């Protein structure tokens, strides 16, 4: 049996060792990283709301009125007025009867999936779904059937083969796939769930606030808002705050209150976070929010086109998440370091986050990037790619 130290050395030798960098000050398009200003190209703060004055003001007012902490789990004494106000806001935003907030996206997915599925049930999960979906499915003890990425023919065959099951059939997918930036085939998934009597759950962590005419997410973009049974999303990405949610029928939300262990056994979100999240939804619903979405879309297109013109494989990206394929772990991390030398901070993505041989730079655009920022980033990536001999992968 290897010691912990030996396992860590194995990770270092394979180019898979991870460590944390220090970010000073606010999250914006430029940050102070380990004491140096850099252009940020790997944040999920897509609309730039994490340091928005309206969110900060809402958080400060909430602390002054409600204090810092919530004190307990919501089923004990930690259920506050702001929890209800935020959940009502989310339900209205998503067009559902009710909503429930969780402490993180990971807690939401593990809690929801392990609550709604169990022994005798079937979970159909896209192979590129987020790790929190994978872990939630494993915790549920249901039978998990993974289908090839966005392969609706394969999914139909699997549903047909398991049509006679007496348990629940649940289709779970990312709305936007977090490492490739492409979209789920939500219209086809909705049709399949209706044909086979399944439930459809969509993790829209990277679509909420960003996609669709009103920022409702990938389901709005695909025209299936009312055909998704459980909308899951996060408050800490485009919305600039913290936490996550499920939006669904009142029956499903009541069920989660009674069965989702990550909700039941967690101290509830604090007032500042709740108030900032409410302010974020208000902003997303405003003309200012529409302008931010428009700016983000323009930046994403400009960046993706620039990388592709430089010969990079952007792996089918359709969103603000734009990968630049590299291949090996060591090469990818060297690429990331060389970019940092030029003042561009973008993380290399390695196994187990992505399969062996598919390492990439996961670049993420923000509405607050200028055109000059975008062009500078493209130029730096193209330059380093040529020097390392990975352009055109």
From Swiss-Prot:
A molecular-function term among this protein's GO annotations: 8-amino-7-oxononanoate synthase activity
Enzyme Commission (EC) number: 2.3.1.47
Matches recorded under InterPro entries: Aminotrans_II_pyridoxalP_BS, Aminotransferase_I/II_large, AON_synthase_class-II, AONS_Archaea/Proteobacteria, AONS_Proteobacteria, PyrdxlP-dep_Trfase, PyrdxlP-dep_Trfase_major, PyrdxlP-dep_Trfase_small
Pathway info: Cofactor biosynthesis; biotin biosynthesis
Catalytic reaction annotation: 6-carboxyhexanoyl-[ACP] + L-alanine + H(+) = (8S)-8-amino-7-oxononanoate + holo-[ACP] + CO2
Keywords in alphabetical order: Biotin biosynthesis, Pyridoxal phosphate, Transferase
Keyword Transferase in record: yes
Modified residues (N6-(pyridoxal phosphate)lysine): 237
Enzyme class at the top of the EC tree: transferase
Single biological process term from Gene Ontology: biotin biosynthetic process
Family designation: Belongs to the class-II pyridoxal-phosphate-dependent aminotransferase family. BioF subfamily.
Function per UniProt: Catalyzes the decarboxylative condensation of pimeloyl-[acyl-carrier protein] and L-alanine to produce 8-amino-7-oxononanoate (AON), [acyl-carrier protein], and carbon dioxide.
Subunit architecture: Homodimer.
Protein name in the entry: 8-amino-7-oxononanoate synthase
Source organism of this protein record: Geotalea daltonii (strain DSM 22248 / JCM 15807 / FRC-32) (Geobacter daltonii)
């Amino acid at each position: 049996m290897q010691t912990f130290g030996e396992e860590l050395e194995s990770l270092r030798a394979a180019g898979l060792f991870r460590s944390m960098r220090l970010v000073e000050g606010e999250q914006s398009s430029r940050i102070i990283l380990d004491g140096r200003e850099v252009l940020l190209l790997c944040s999920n703060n897509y609309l730039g709301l994490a340091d928005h004055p309206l969110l900060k003001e809402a958080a400060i007012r909430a602390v002054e009125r409600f204090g810092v902490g919530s004190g307990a789990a919501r089923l004990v004494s930690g259920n506050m007025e702001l929890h209800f106000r935020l959940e009502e806001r989310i339900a209205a935003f998503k067009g559902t009867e009710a909503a429930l907030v969780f402490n993180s996206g990971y807690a939401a997915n593990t809690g929801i999936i392990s609550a709604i599925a169990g022994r005798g049930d079937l979970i159909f999960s896209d192979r590129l779904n987020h790790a929190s979906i994978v872990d939630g499915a494993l915790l549920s003890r249901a039978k998990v059937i993974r289908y090839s990425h966005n392969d609706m023919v394969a999914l139909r065959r699997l549903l047909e083969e398991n049509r006679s099951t007496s348990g629940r059939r649940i289709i779970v997918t990312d709305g936007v796939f977090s490492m490739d930036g492409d979209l789920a085939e939500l219209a086809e998934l909705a049709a399949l769930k209706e044909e086979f009597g399944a439930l459809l759950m969509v993790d829209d962590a990277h679509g909420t606030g960003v996609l669709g005419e009103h920022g409702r997410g990938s389901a709005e973009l695909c025209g299936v808002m009312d055909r998704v049974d459980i909308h899951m999303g996060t408050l800490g990405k485009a919305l600039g705050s913290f936490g996550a949610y499920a939006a669904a029928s009142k029956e499903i939300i009541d069920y989660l209150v009674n069965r989702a262990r990550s909700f039941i056994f967690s101290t509830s979100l604090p007032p500042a976070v709740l108030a900032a999240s409410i302010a974020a939804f208000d902003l997303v619903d405003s003309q200012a929010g529409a302008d931010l979405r428009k700016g983000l879309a323009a930046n994403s297109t400009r960046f993706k086109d620039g990388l592709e013109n430089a010969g990079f494989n952007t792996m089918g990206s359709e969103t603000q998440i734009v990968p630049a394929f590299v291949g090996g772990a060591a090469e990818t991390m060297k690429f990331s370091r060389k970019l940092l030398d030029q003042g561009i901070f973008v993380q290399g993505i390695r196994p187990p986050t992505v399969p062996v041989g598919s390492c990439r730079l996961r670049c993420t655009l923000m509405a607050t990037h200028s055109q000059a920022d975008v062009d500078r980033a493209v130029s730096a990536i193209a330059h380093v790619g040529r020097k390392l001999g990975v352009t055109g992968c």
